[in-house]
Regions:
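HIT superfamily nucleotide-processing domains
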Residues: 1-151
Length: 151
């Protein structure tokens, strides 16, 4: 737990929340400023400021929990789909520096939009090969070993 982290305090019970799911590694609770009814935040119990700092095992656990919670939220609210996302870093809209996945149930006509509504610029499509190569090179430099989650 990080001393001044809002989500660490929620996970420890110091600050109340509307918990919907908990296991040894993940805690999920309702967003207090929901984008739609059922908007749930899924967070690792271990404190990570950034998604890219996470251990591979915790990434797998977080996303498996997010998958289960998305299915439950969609069923509970008769949603026709969901936005599932992470704001990674302050510039991307991360308001609490503790990794969390937003699960936002969606219905036709709800007024919401898709992921491209977050930021959209017209990229230069003539340099897609260069862009892809830049990412592949960076992946090789930052690659971690593959992980198999037991059980």
């Amino acid at each position: 737990m990080t001393e001044n982290c809002l989500f660490c305090k929620i996970i420890s019970g110091e600050i109340p929340s509307k918990r919907v799911y908990e296991d040894d590694y993940v805690y999920a609770f309702l967003d207090i400023y929901p984008a739609s009814e059922g908007h749930t935040l899924v967070t690792p119990k271990k404190h990570y400021n950034s998604f890219t700092d996470m251990d591979p095992e915790d990434v797998a656990r977080l996303f498996e929990a997010a998958r289960k919670i998305t299915a439950a939220v969609e069923k509970a609210f008769s949603a026709e789909g969901s936005n599932i996302g992470i704001n990674n870093g302050e510039v991307a809209g991360q308001e609490v520096p503790h990794v969390h996945v937003h699960v936002i149930p969606r219905k036709k006509g709800d007024g919401g939009r898709g992921i491209k509504s977050i930021v959209w610029t017209e990229p230069d499509r003539t340099n897609l090969n260069d862009v892809a190569e830049k990412i592949r090179k960076s992946l090789k430099e930052t690659e971690r070993p593959q992980v198999t989650i037991p059980g």
